[in-house]
């Protein structure tokens, strides 16, 4: 190789290349050239610091071209082609509906479930999915909204809904006979813009019309997935122009996979991949234990995992307690959060709630159960502090 000299930024170098034998002799090719070497950091810094001076004429040309393109779009297409961020997002803070649990609202990061989006709640049987859906309906009705419950499982219990606090007289309930009818109802109600919450219970129970008409035993591969894919594209378009919250309840199935001679079971949701894709938020509910009172099972503990969240950081968890026949243990978590944030004062075992001195945690929870006005006041103060609403 040639010897290089680093004495100057521009240097001369020489190298030799031995090629294969030609006509019995070895040919030698000699080349020379120049190479730039900048050894000073000052030269590199000066190159990076030289920014192009803004040209007002180019900026004006770009602005004129943009206005011409927008004028062409408005003339050639309908109003939906209008490019404007404020047209779709008029408020910086998204409108939400509470889940009925402050702990879960905190895990979601925005204070609840967003309007104008689709949400998937999935888990195994008896994990609290229906209870969560009824609490969402209850919170929406508090705000004066209309709600619809589409019961594909034929398992809606009006007495349970009323015990949780749902006004069943103002609740729209439907039991469509097929998946196509169910999803068409969702699309029509969403386009109307008059319904605040739509609950579909559940995706796993949606039966395509072809399966209902065929005898038992015939297989229709991926029919439900294809129907969900087509329908959710329409619903996703409709929900973008409304303030409707659509909650899909779903179940999980065990799918056995083989990995290099080691088969293992993997949990998958029903209905294919369309719903996980279109859903802005996905919640997974897991039973973690039972609640016993006087040696009797009175409820269960569940863990809600935020698997997907397009509005805030995801992968958070929330521990909830469900009282059979009454819904969430709201008073317990409100008392804990209120003491933590100074809304309710606690000294030892004494609690100071609205001028009342109450001894013991159980007595304080009972006081909140019996005094709904005090509970609502504490919840309002907490939501104002936690979410700055």
Swiss-Prot record:
One of its GO terms (cellular component) is mitochondrion. PROSITE patterns: RECA_2, RECA_3. InterPro entries: DNA_recomb/repair_RecA, P-loop_NTPase, RecA-like_N, RecA_ATP-bd, RecA_C_sf, RecA_monomer-monomer_interface. It is found in: Mitochondrion. The keyword Nucleotide-binding applies. One of its GO terms (molecular function) is ATP-dependent DNA damage sensor activity. Gene3D superfamilies: P-loop containing nucleotide triphosphate hydrolases. Signal peptide: none annotated. Keywords: ATP-binding, DNA damage, DNA recombination, DNA-binding, Mitochondrion, Nucleotide-binding, Transit peptide. ATP binds at residues 123-130. One of its GO terms (biological process) is DNA recombination. Residues 1-15 form a transit peptide. Involved in recombination ability and DNA strand transfer activity. Belongs to the RecA family. This is DNA repair protein recA homolog 2, mitochondrial.
